[in-house]
């Protein structure tokens, strides 16, 4: 049986980013079962553009902030019985093999697998530096190297799976995990939703 994947994108007034994101999603090696865009009441032509995209589902709602958009999209994923939700910021451009690699890496032991987010021009530079973890999976505090900011150094010093995620930046989350922990707290309008959910 093939697992079903909902690619969820939340957007607000960033049409040029969104167009590019959708193009990358539509050209994945592993077919996405459905793409859902939650439009937080954009007024830059986003809704009109999305109405021309017949293969993309759209929920237009008042601007409830990013957490409100994620909350709405996750509710949709739960209601429609997807196996996974692939969380994608509208300025994310996943590599062609991203979804295939995430799905192939997922096991019952995982609740979420996240890609690293790379600088588009400097491919070795991590957009979000990753904290160095000690043997107890806690961030290292007393060290010259407390965060990895280059992909090559991160790969050299870490395992295949690392107990850290950049949620909403290409993370694949299982619906079974969402059913256990619940949906995102939609009261975080702009910041804090990722930290709270992680």
Residue spans of the language-model regions?
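A recurrent flexible, glycine/aromatic-enriched loop bordering the glycosyltransferase active site
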Residues: 153-173
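Short beta-strand/loop segment that forms part of the nucleotide-sugar
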Residues: 33-41, 59-61
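Short beta-strand-to-loop acidic/aromatic patch adjacent to the donor-nucleotide binding site
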Residues: 82-91
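A conserved acidic beta->alpha catalytic loop
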Residues: 24, 39-48, 92
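A short, conserved alpha-helix in the catalytic core of glycosyltransferases
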Residues: 166, 171, 177-182, 187-198
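Short, well-formed alpha-helical segments that are part of the catalytic scaffolds
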Residues: 14-27
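Conserved donor NDP-sugar-binding/catalytic core segment of glycosyltransferases
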Residues: 97-136
